[in-house]
Amino acid sequence: SCPCDANSCIMSATLSNEPSSRFSDCSFSLPSRFSDCSFNQYSSDIIHYHECLLNEPSRTDIVSPPVCGNYYPEVGEDCDCGPPANCQNPCCDAATCGLTTGSQCAEGLCCDQCRLKKAGTICRKARGDNPDDRCTGQSGVCPRNT
């Protein structure tokens, strides 16, 4: 049994049919909580499998056309700091999603104040059997040495 304080839980086999939890006579309210079991499983997974959360998706994984201003640098964009009114990155031109004049990079563990760190600079310390990850001097992204 996986108790949930709400009328129905996310991932529940059924939705509550109680009138107090419905939007109207012909709809159900959407669950807003995970059951205790789901929450505990999620917490355990984060603790034991958190390494995969560090894997950034590749720009080529996106199948839709690039959209400047969505906070995600896609193919053809040097950076993406969101809409011009929200951009807080001095290295990125929010209107073009390109680097500002004189900038070499806009983000990443190998980027410091809009300048690329030197090749060989440690950007991520060794963990387990994996060696230190080092900057290439060509990108702000810290490559994974596996």
From Swiss-Prot:
One Gene Ontology cellular component: extracellular region
Gene Ontology BP term (one): proteolysis
Pfam families: Disintegrin (PF00200)
InterPro entries: Disintegrin_CS, Disintegrin_dom, Disintegrin_dom_sf, Peptidase_M12B
Disulfide bonds listed in the record: 2-37, 4-9, 68-87, 79-97, 81-92, 91-114, 105-111, 110-135, 123-142
Domain named Disintegrin: residues: 65-146
Residue ranges of the motif Cell attachment site: 127-129
GO MF terms, alphabetically ordered: metal ion binding; metalloendopeptidase activity; toxin activity
Subunit annotation: Monomer (disintegrin).
Role, per record: Snake venom zinc metalloproteinase that inhibits ADP-induced platelet aggregation (probably by binding integrin alpha-IIb/beta-3 (ITGA2B/ITGB3)) and degrades fibrinogen.
Stated name of the protein: Zinc metalloproteinase-disintegrin salmosin-3
Organism: Gloydius brevicauda (Korean slamosa snake)
Species lineage: Eukaryota, Metazoa, Chordata, Craniata, Vertebrata
